[in-house]
Amino acid sequence: MNQNKPVIINGIPCYSPQVDSQHNDYPESGLKKLYELESKHFWFISRYEFIIKTITKRTNSNCRFIEIGAGTGNVSRKLMDKGFKPAVGEIHLSGLQYAKSYGITECYQFDLYNTPFSDCYDAIGLFDVLEHLDKPEKALSNINSMLRDNGLLYITVPAHMWLWNKYDRLAGHKIRYTKPSLIQVAQQANFDIIECRYFFIFITPLLWLRSKLHPDKHLEATIQEEDSEIHVNTMINKTLLAICRLENLINHLLPNIFGGSLILVVRKRANKDNI
């Protein structure tokens, strides 16, 4: 646990300011693109809608909630629309500046491998973060210590290595998970499993096709290739958003065997000394 006093930079408590410039697990340059596209791109919209639906089903808006690895804070921004008052944690200061622009006031810069908080949150969100980490077990163990007894952790990750493509590597991914492998990592960190489901099921064939058209050959992508991955034709974007929203409505009825992503809900085991 990081017991150092934070350095205040641009009004943000920074517990690991030296790590910001050295951190390579997620490219800081991607945050600007995220900020520009998260409110427009079908993938981001349907993703946060599915996450919000999952969270509000199990967690009250008056709880102490923090999103870790929050990027620009877009998911927390949407939680605010549901009455939550979330905090956000992020390694990159630039991401926290974007979060502040959304009206999120409680922002912290820290390293997930050296967290500054203990036993103080009722629920935590970790959305598309775990796949960037070399030591996911350590990160989840640290998150466990941040939660109060019986606190909930919500996780999303990309699914299936057979969907791996060059854009995974360019995004800083280390792995794509399966349901069993994600559950195993969480259980090793002393969590009890509540729910684990695949989503982005309907577009999985398109994601498979992408993996074949853009395999990871360890070559650098051109700016044009990176832009083509992010920018989608308006009509195609609207169509895919409609498809994903339909899936979100009936996801609980679909076979839970594959999908482009996974969502995992786990609970911290109560400390027997406190029972």
Which residues does each predicted region cover?
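Conserved N-terminal segment of class I S-adenosyl-L-methionine
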Residues: M1-F127, K138-L140, E225, E229-T234, ...
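Short, glycine-/aromatic-enriched active-site segment of Class I SAM-dependent methyltransferases
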Residues: Y35-E36, L153-I175, K179-Q187
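Residues lining the SAM
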Residues: F127-L130, T156
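A short glycine-rich, Lys/Arg-flanked "PGG" loop and its adjoining helix->strand segment in the class I
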Residues: E137-L152
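Conserved S-adenosyl-L-methionine
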Residues: F191-I201
